[in-house]
């Protein structure tokens, strides 16, 4: 019997494998979603370092948002990560949704990042 944790890990590996094949040297926009907050970071897998990051726990975000776990918060994080990526000179990324379904908060973050100028 396969546990739900193993299914999630397998799905994340499958998505990561597809991203690695399509990356062509582009950094990846990785999303982590918890029950309370949402986090995004742009990672350069070639050098193994984080180029930009944003989350709902940052001081400016915490004060302006009612909750860190809704679509508005995800949209704000998407806008912020796109802004920080632009400052770092990053225009193209590969979107890494991990094991999460492209729906709800993950989709809101992706659309905000696209609206902010990132292309993927």
From Swiss-Prot:
Keywords: Ribonucleoprotein, Ribosomal protein, RNA-binding, rRNA-binding
Database matches in InterPro entries: Ribosomal_uL18_bac-type, Ribosomal_uL18_bac/euk
UniProt cross-references to CDD domains, sorted A to Z: Ribosomal_L18_L5e
Keyword RNA-binding listed: yes
GO-annotated molecular function: 5S rRNA binding; structural constituent of ribosome
GO terms (BP aspect): translation
GO cellular component, one term: cytosolic large ribosomal subunit
Matching SUPFAM superfamilies: Translational machinery components
Domain of life: Bacteria
Segments forming a coiled coil: none
Family of the protein in this entry: Belongs to the universal ribosomal protein uL18 family.
Assembly and oligomerization: Part of the 50S ribosomal subunit; part of the 5S rRNA/L5/L18/L25 subcomplex. Contacts the 5S and 23S rRNAs.
Stated role: This is one of the proteins that bind and probably mediate the attachment of the 5S RNA into the large ribosomal subunit, where it forms part of the central protuberance.
Entry-linked HAMAP family: Ribosomal_uL18_B
Protein's name in the database: Large ribosomal subunit protein uL18
């Amino acid at each position: 019997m396969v546990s739900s944790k193993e299914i999630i890990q397998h799905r994340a590996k499958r998505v990561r494998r597809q991203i690695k094949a399509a990356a062509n040297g582009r950094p990846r926009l990785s999303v982590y979603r918890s029950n309370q907050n949402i986090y995004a970071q742009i990672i350069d897998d070639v050098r193994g370092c984080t180029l930009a990051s944003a989350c709902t726990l940052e001081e400016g975000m915490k004060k302006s948002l009612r909750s860190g776990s809704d679509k508005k918060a995800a949209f704000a994080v998407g806008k912020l990560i796109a802004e920080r990526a632009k400052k770092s000179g990053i225009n193209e990324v590969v979107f890494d949704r991990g094991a999460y379904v492209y729906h709800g908060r993950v989709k809101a973050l992706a659309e905000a990042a696209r609206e902010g100028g990132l292309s993927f």
